[in-house]
C-alpha cells in the first residue's frame, strides 16, 4: 500500500526545519550506505549523531505520534529515528531495496523495515527532477509531494530518486516496523478503518458499527505481533 500523509508539519514548523537544514553540516551520503547501495548513491546526508539530526528526528517522531492518518495506516510498533538527506547538482540514488533490518543507534535494539517513509521539506517547484520512483506490481510511481507532506510505501519496494538537475531537494526518510508485518493485511485494516469512520459520521446509531469495530479489532488481534 502506498499512501500520502498530508500536512505532517505546519507552515511554521516547516520553515524552522528548513532554516536549520539549510545551515547543516552535510556529508557524503555514501558513508551511510552498504557496499552495493553506495555504488548507486549520490547525495548528501546528515550524520546520525549530528546534534541537529537528533533534535529534528525527535521532533518528527513527536509529530508522527500526533498524526492520526500515519498511526492508522502504519500501525507502528517501532519507528527508526528519522534521517535527513539533500540532493542537488545531479544528485540521485539508483534502484535499490532498503535493508530488511536496521540497528537503532545507541541501543542494542533492531527494527524490521516493513514500511519506508519520505517526508518532503522542499516544494516541488523549487527543484527539477528528484522524483521518488517506486516500483510495484502495477508499474512505476513517480512521487514529488508538497513540502510538509509524506509518503508511505512497502519496505519491499524497489525504488530510486531521479537526478536533481536544478535546485535543492531536502527530505527526511525513515522506516517503520508495523504491528502488522504483511502489507496486504495492513491495507485491509486501513480500508476497514476508513469504512468505520464513514459510518460513524453518517449513521452513528447504525447497528453495523459495533460489528465493524469488532471485526477490525479481531483482525488486528489475529494479525498483529507486539
Curated annotation (Swiss-Prot):
GO terms for molecular function: 2-oxoglutarate-dependent dioxygenase activity; iron ion binding; L-ascorbic acid binding. Keywords: Dioxygenase, Iron, Metal-binding, Oxidoreductase, Vitamin C. PROSITE patterns: FE2OG_OXY. Pfam families: 2OG-FeII_Oxy_3, PKHD_C. Binds 1 Fe(2+) ion per subunit. The keyword Nucleotide-binding does not apply. InterPro entries: Oxoglu/Fe-dep_dioxygenase_dom (IPR005123), PKHD_C (IPR041097), PKHD_hydroxylase (IPR023550), Pro_4_hyd_alph (IPR006620), Pro_4_hyd_alph_FE2OG_OXY (IPR044862). Gene3D superfamilies: q2cbj1_9rhob like domain (2.60.120.620), Rabenosyn, Rab binding domain (4.10.860.20). It comes from the Bacteria. One of its GO terms (biological process) is DNA damage response. Its EC number is 1.14.11.-. Its cofactor is Fe(2+); L-ascorbate. Residues 78-178 form the Fe2OG dioxygenase domain. 2-oxoglutarate binds at residue 169. Fe cation binds at residues 96, 98, 159. NCBIfam families: PRK05467.1-3 (NF003974), PRK05467.1-4 (NF003975). This is PKHD-type hydroxylase Plav_0377. It comes from Parvibaculum lavamentivorans (strain DS-1 / DSM 13023 / NCIMB 13966).
